[in-house]
């Protein structure tokens, strides 16, 4: 038992000099500082934006997926962030999971019906800002049905992007949907 404790503590002892030698952490280009937000219209960076999702699989476990190639805009004025406008289009055919069979099934009429509905779209209607967080209300159109949703949003950072040299801002947003409200009723409720 004493040897085990020693072996666990040893990496911590060896790491201490390394930690002590480090200077201040390097400054990232994006910092969660609202003063760095420039007013204007921002285009969604389709290469670095995605919608991640998870769904419970019959009470056994969760599985996960994503949509990529997101397009859209954010209009924002840091002097009046509550007036921000978001308009985002999600190409449904970009749905991806770790299983090709599941991905293919999700594209059928049982779920997203990509042959009939190419995209989903979120358009904001209001924003309530509280520091680094906001509740963004809007309408989500999916499978030809439009319903209101609320996005719990967190400001992540602003600054000049070193890759494209443009002013860039980043956010995370989360919501919970009841898919049957958009007509996706296969295997509901189970």
Model-derived regions: residue spans:
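Positively charged n-region of N-terminal signal peptides that target proteins for export
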Residues: 1-6
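FAD cofactor-binding and catalytic pocket of flavoenzymes
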Residues: 9
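Low-complexity, acidic/polar, glycine-enriched regions of mature
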Residues: 21-190
């Amino acid at each position: 038992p004493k040897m085990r404790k020693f072996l666990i503590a040893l990496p911590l002892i060896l790491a201490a000099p390394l930690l002590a030698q480090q200077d201040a952490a390097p400054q990232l280009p994006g910092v969660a500082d609202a003063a760095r937000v420039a007013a204007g219209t921002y285009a969604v960076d389709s290469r670095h934006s995605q919608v991640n999702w998870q769904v419970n699989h019959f009470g056994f476990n969760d599985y996960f997926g994503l949509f990529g190639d997101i397009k859209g805009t954010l209009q924002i004025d840091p002097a009046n962030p509550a007036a921000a406008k978001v308009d985002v289009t999600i190409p449904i055919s970009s749905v991806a999971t770790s299983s090709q069979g599941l991905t293919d099934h999700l594209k059928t009429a049982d779920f997203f019906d990509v042959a009939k509905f190419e995209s989903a779209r979120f358009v904001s209607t209001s924003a309530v800002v509280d520091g680094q967080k906001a509740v963004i209300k809007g309408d989500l159109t999916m499978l030809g049905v439009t319903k209101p949703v609320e996005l719990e949003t967190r400001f992540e950072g602003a600054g000049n992007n070193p890759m494209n040299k443009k002013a860039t801002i980043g956010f995370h947003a989360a919501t919970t949907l009841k898919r049957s409200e958009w007509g996706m009723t296969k295997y509901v409720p189970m």
